[in-house]
Amino acid sequence: MDRRRKENLLIIAAVAVVVISFLFMFSKKWHSRLNGNDSLDVTRLHDATTVSSLIGRGTDVRQDFVCPYDTIKELVIIFSKTDDANAEIVTVSLLDGQLPVFSQTISVQDIRSQHRTRISVGASGLKGHSLTLSISSDSDTGLALMIDEETEAYYRIDGQALKGTICFAVYGN
């Protein structure tokens, strides 16, 4: 009886280890799907494979990433622009949780389609922080973002997770 009880406890412990391991792996994948891939390489621009939907009135496009630098000096984003893009503005922000680290408005007229849009940042003390790149507008802009769908990362449009990453890079030291 005592031996049988030990065997049962051993089996229960083994099953518990397997279940906990599975839950841990599943939660990591689920976290990645909701928040983007924590290992997303933001030190280089990704090659675009598609274009996002247009950034219009009230649209909020977000990409989560872990900052590899203590100081972010520059942010580079590749936009796509329609022929009828107007003179409206787009807001580019970096958030640390809900706290804004950086925010700048850019005139759509100053953006060249499918070229690097360089934005000076100068924010410090960010190495290892989970940041969110947020791109939004209060008006219809005629702008979209270049997207690399061949990554395991996810970006969000108005809270909906979509496979891929915005074609952007962060430079600093």
Name what the model sees in each region.
Residues 2-99, 109-130, 136-173:
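Beta-sheet-rich sandwich/jelly-roll-like modules and their strand-loop junctions
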Residues 104-106:
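Short hydrophobic alpha-helix segments
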